[in-house]
Amino acid sequence: MSDNSPITSITAASLQPELWTSSSNDALQIYITDSDGTALNFHPNFTYPIFGDSEQIFGYRDLVIFLCFDHCTFYPFLNVKYSDKLNDDTLEDPREKLLSYLPESTIFKDEVKWVDSINKEKEGFEIPGELVGNIFTHGDDKFGIYKLDLKNAQGLELHKRLQILVLLFIEAGSYIDHQDELWDIYVMYKVTDEKTPSIIGFCTAYNYWKYGGFEKFDSNQQEVRKKISQFIVLPMYQGLKLGGRFYNKLYEYWMQDPRVIEVVVEDPSESFDDLRDRCDLTRLCQNTIKVASVDLPLINTEWATKLRQEQKLEKRQFSRLLEMILIYQLEHNLTNITKKQVRLFIKKRLYEKNKEILDGLDEPTRLDKLQTAYASLESDYKRILSGLSLHKRALDSTEGSSKKSKPNV
C-alpha cells in the first residue's frame, strides 16, 4: 500500500461509493514516540474542523494517514498511504488538508529526515519556557509545568506543533491568536530524564483585564480574570491523575499571583467539569474550611463572599461547591440540617436562575420542573462526590482529562 498506487476511473467507483469512502477519524492514526523509542498510537476524537462535518474522505481505498510526533520536541511527521485512488482532479487531498494546519517544519514521508531533525533539535535541548512553581513528584516520576514564551522562536514553534491537538481532541476547539499577548500557554512535562523530557499535556488561558475601581486604576494595579480555555492531557497519560495535578499546580500558581482575582473556565466538557469540581472541592476542604462547619445560615453572608474571593472562585462554581458540601454532609451524617432544607435551598437557586421561564408555567408544571431539575442535579453531585473523603482530608482524587472549548481554547 502506498501513495503511488494505481488510479481507478470515477465511473467504476460510482457503482460502489462505500468502497472509496473512509472515516477520517479512523483513517487518521496519531503516534507519539516514547523515551525508549517505541511509539504509542491512538485516534482523534474529532476531525470535522479539518475534513468537514461528515468526517469522511472520499476517493481512496484503504486510506491510512500517519501523524507522528516526538515525545520531547513534538517535531511533526506526516505520511499518507492508500491502495488505490480515483482518477478525479476534484478529490480532496488529505495531505494538503493536514499540512495547512501543521507548522512549516512538518516533514512529509521522509522518516530518515524526520529522525535526523529530531536528533539535531535534542542536542543541548532546553524546554522553551519558564518553570511555573517547583518540580514535583507523582509516583516514581518528576514533573514540571512551563509557561511558553511566544516571543521566543522555539516557544512559538512548540505552540504551532501542539495546537493541532486542539482540533482533534476538543469539541468546537479552534486555534488561538498567538500574537495576542493576553494568551498564556502552559506545557506540562515529565522531567525524570532532564535531557529528554516528555510532553504530558498543555493548557491555554486568557487574561481578561478587570476594572478594580479608580484608586487601583490610578495606582496602576492590574487585576485580571484568568480564563482557562483549552486543557489537554495526552491520551496515554489520562487516567493517571496527572490532569488533576496539572490543574492544581496551575491554580496554586494563580493563587499566589496578586493580579489574578478570579479563575474561570470557558465552556468545559463534562469530564473537565468533573476534574475541576473534585480538585476545587478537595482544595477547599483540605486547606480552607472544615466540611462540618458549612451551614445554611452562613452561605449567603459576608463569610461566604469573602471565602469565594479569597479562593478566586467564580460565583456559579462557588455555589455548586457549597451545594455539593451540603449533600456530602447529609451522606456522611455531618450536619443537623435536614434533607428537605437542603433541597429547598438548592431549588431556590434553580428557580432564580430560570425565573423568567418558570414564571410562565402553571404552578404544578413549575414545581414538577424544579423537582426534576433538583433530582438530576443531586444525582450528579453524588456521582462527583463518589470516592472523595473530604472530611478526612483525603489526598487528591482526580483524573486526567481534556476540556472542550468554543472559539478560542
Swiss-Prot record:
It is an enzyme of class 2 (transferase). Keywords: Acyltransferase, Chromatin regulator, Cytoplasm, DNA damage, DNA repair, Nucleus, Transferase. Its EC number is 2.3.1.48. GO terms for cellular component: chromosome, telomeric region; cytoplasm; histone acetyltransferase complex; nucleus. InterPro entries: Acyl_CoA_acyltransferase (IPR016181), Hat1_N (IPR019467), Hat1_N_sf (IPR037113), Hist_AcTrfase_B-typ_cat-su (IPR017380), Hist_AcTrfase_HAT1_C (IPR013523). GO terms for molecular function: chromatin binding; histone acetyltransferase activity; histone binding. Its main location: cytoplasm. The record marks 183 as: Interaction with histone H4 N-terminus. Residues 53-55, 206-208 are annotated as: Interaction with histone H4 N-terminus. Catalytic component of the histone acetylase B (HAT-B) complex. Acetylates 'Lys-12' of histone H4 which is required for telomeric silencing. Has intrinsic substrate specificity that modifies lysine in recognition sequence GXGKXG. Involved in DNA double-strand break repair. Component of the HAT-B complex composed of at least HAT1 and HAT2. The HAT-B complex binds to histone H4 tail. This is Histone acetyltransferase type B catalytic subunit. It comes from Debaryomyces hansenii (strain ATCC 36239 / CBS 767 / BCRC 21394 / JCM 1990 / NBRC 0083 / IGC 2968).
